[in-house]
Every structure is written in C-alpha cells, then in structure tokens.
Amino acid sequence: MPEGPASAVTYPGDVSRIVVLDYGSGNLRSAERALRRVGADVTVTADRHAALEADGLVVPGVGAFAACMAGLNAVDGPSIIDHRLAGGRPVLGICVGMQVLFDRGVEWDERTDGCAQWPGTVERLKADVLPHMGWNTVSAPVGSTLFAGLDADTRFYFVHSFGVRRWEMEVSTAIRPPLVTWANHGEDFVAAVENGALSATQFHPEKSGDAGAAVLRNWLRDVVG
C-alpha cells in the first residue's frame, strides 16, 4: 500500500501529547510517524490512563468491523472514548476506526454493535469494483476544520469495501450538527465527520502524503489545540 511523501515540520507552540490506541488493529506505526512529522509527541499504547490523559487520542483501524470492535472491547476502548468525549477531549478515528464510531456494522450478514457515537450503519458499498483502493477527492462542507486550506481537487488515499452510505442523525436546532464530508465510489459515502471533540476520516491521512499531513496538522492545531 503506497504512502505519499510527507515533509517534516516543526509544530508551533506547545507540543501536543497524542496517544495512538493499540488494540491489535490499524496502521499504528504509520499513524505514529505521520503524527510525529507534523510535530506531535506520540505514544502507541493500550494503557487506559495514558489514553485518557493525552491531549488527543487516535483510534486507527483496518480489516473487519467485528474484529476491530472485539479488539476495542478487549482494551475498554468504547469506555475510553466515552470518557474522553464527556470531558471534551479530542478523539480522531481513522478508516475502520471511524466506522466503529457508528451504531453498527453489517458484514456478510453479520451484525456487530459499534461504539454508537453516531447513528448509522456501516455496510458494503454498492460499487462495481471493490475494494475502493486508491486516491480520491472529497466534498467538504463550508466551515470544515480538517480540510481548511485544501483545494477541492485534493486527493486522499482510501482502501475499504464498507462504509457509511447514509447520514442518519436528525438535524436539531438545539445543537450544532456535525460537519459531514462525502466522497464517491460508485455511490456517495461518508469520508469524514467533524463533531466537536470527535473527528473521523474514512481515508488514511497517514498514507495521504502532504494532503494527509495537512489534515492531521489542522486537527492538532484547531481541535486538539
């Protein structure tokens, strides 16, 4: 799986302490390297205390939804995510790490409960060619933090066969709705979500070269702070 180049930079201000949650899934070292390149102090660990106390928590994920949820449950991941968000502490999900934030995943008729941070179902995309593997543009909403400063034709690296095909959260005038970014591979699917302290991307920023580095830098600066 190719990784585009990402230039090393010095992150301005205080260094953010980031934990990449090690629950047996995900491109842990790729995520660690990408975050270090944009100036973060990164620890890869399953330790609950470290995950709760970090400035930001990254939840990566590759493979099957059910396997990722089993790994998360084994390290008390859903509780860690809940506790962080209750305190307004940033969490970033990547690829299947985004998918498990939804209510449920359905793979080959097997249904698995997710972390239920957002309503919705992860299911197989209706595309002629799967997996969706390679570079693709996204359609980010006005006001996006993650994609600030990036052109509309910027491409990100995807590799997945399943995704969120419908956004199911009802709009409420009482709260600010999440910002949802879309991409298309045979049909539209959710490419990213920005919801206060909770952010997620279906694509791999750690494998998306300078574009992915910009997304991670925006997250560190404007969400983690």
Language model segments and positions:
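Acyltransferase
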Residues: 10, 198-225
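Extreme N-terminal starter segment of soluble prokaryotic enzymes
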Residues: 14-19
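Pocket-forming structural segment of enzyme catalytic cores
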Residues: 103-183
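Short acidic/histidine-rich motifs immediately flanking catalytic phosphotransfer sites
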Residues: 51-61
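Cysteine-nucleophile active-site neighborhood
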Residues: 63-135
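Beta-strand-turn-beta hairpins that frame and shape the catalytic cleft
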Residues: 153, 194-199
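Short, surface-exposed beta-strand/loop micro-motifs that present aromatic residues
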Residues: 187-194
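Short acidic low-complexity segments
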Residues: 42-53
